[in-house]
A protein has these predicted regions:
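Short alpha-helix in the alpha/beta-hydrolase fold that links the catalytic acid
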Residues: 51, 212, 225-235
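Primarily recognizes the serine-hydrolase "nucleophile elbow" in alpha/beta-hydrolase
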Residues: 104-166
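Short beta-strand/loop motif that positions the catalytic acidic residue
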Residues: 209-210, 216-218, 222
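Catalytic active-site module of serine/aspartate enzymes centered on a nucleophile-bearing elbow/loop
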Residues: 247, 251, 255-278
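Acidic catalytic loop of the alpha/beta-hydrolase fold
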Residues: 221-225, 249
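Short, surface-exposed "cap/lid" segments of acyl-processing enzymes
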Residues: 29-74
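N-terminal cap/lid segment of alpha/beta-hydrolase-fold proteins
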Residues: 1-31
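Alpha/beta-hydrolase active-site loop
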Residues: 87-112
Length: 278
């Protein structure tokens, strides 16, 4: 296999922004101008499951791959896999995540000279796919989108109105993390932020504005994000390609992943993506 190199770095925070932990995997002989920036999903993180193996395979095929943890995903710089920072998790919202993508793209272009004129692609899994779509509608010069089991809207994923009323009354709502057994808090501001910015946080309108190519990869056995989401995304894409597989929401992968191979469905998606971007 061709050699790759990997470096970790932190995009420093400000008084108003938390730091973002990143890693960049690229071909050992770096000669291309292609970069995928990957957005993880809800309760996810950059080192989940097979994401490191996926980064390696893209780099082995000449495409650099950057993964990052959203600044408020609940991880920390020193403990990026579990969720020790529940305060940050509770303060997260969609607007913060879209801004995080903007910060990452800007940092890459300013700090890595060999990417200053790169073709930049956004890839997102599940909720991260929607964030990638919205970010692409900003003036970031994104070349293409790759959406993995992506949601097609956020509004329908909120609970029923009676639950929203309880959420508002209590100020916080808890969701279980089955992996860590934690009760993860969502402050009501998460919902209020969506309501206040609904027109901006609209995946359909964002995708219709995006003039580049979009690859939509989705499993027909996905129980977390129904396949109809993929059909929606495809219908809204100006240049859309749908890749349908008989697989689940994580394409046969899980966390932790202790194997040294990529599950078949995810490997097929990587191969399809490489072809799509060539």
């Amino acid at each position: 296999m061709p050699k790759t190199t990997k470096e970790k770095f932190v995009i420093q925070g400000t008084a108003y922004e938390k730091p973002i932990l990143c890693d960049l995997t690229k071909p050992f002989q770096h000669h291309d101008k292609n970069l995928i920036i990957f957005c993880h999903g809800y309760k996810g993180f950059k080192d989940w499951g097979c994401w490191n193996l996926m980064a390696d395979k893209f780099a082995q095929n000449g495409i650099s791959f950057l993964k990052f943890n959203f600044s408020h995903n609940g991880g920390t710089i020193n403990n990026p896999i579990d969720f020790p920072d529940l305060k940050a998790f509770s303060e997260n919202n969609y607007s913060i995540e879209v801004n995080d993508v903007t910060r990452v793209v800007s940092y890459v272009k300013n700090e890595f000279t060999y990417f200053s004129n790169a073709k930049i692609y956004l890839m997102g899994h599940s909720r991260g796919g929607g964030i990638a779509c919205i970010a692409s509608s900003r003036d970031l010069h994104i070349e293409s989108l790759i959406l993995l089991a992506s949601v097609s809207d956020y509004k329908s994923r909120f609970p029923e109105q009676c639950e929203i009323d309880k959420w508002k009354e209590n100020g916080v709502r808890y969701v279980e993390n089955k992996r860590t057994k934690q009760k993860l808090p969502h402050l009501y501001q998460f919902y209020q932020n969506y309501v206040d910015n609904e027109s901006i946080l609209n995946i359909e309108s964002s995708l219709k504005k995006f003039s580049g190519k979009t690859l939509i990869c989705h499993g027909t056995m996905d129980l977390a994000v129904d396949f109809q989401n993929a059909l929606n995304l495809c219908s809204w894409s100006n240049i859309g390609c749908l890749f349908k597989l008989r697989t689940n929401h994580t394409f046969g992968s899980k966390h932790p992943w202790n194997e040294n191979h990529i599950p078949t469905a995810l490997d097929q998606i990587i191969e399809k993506s490489i072809s799509f971007l060539s």
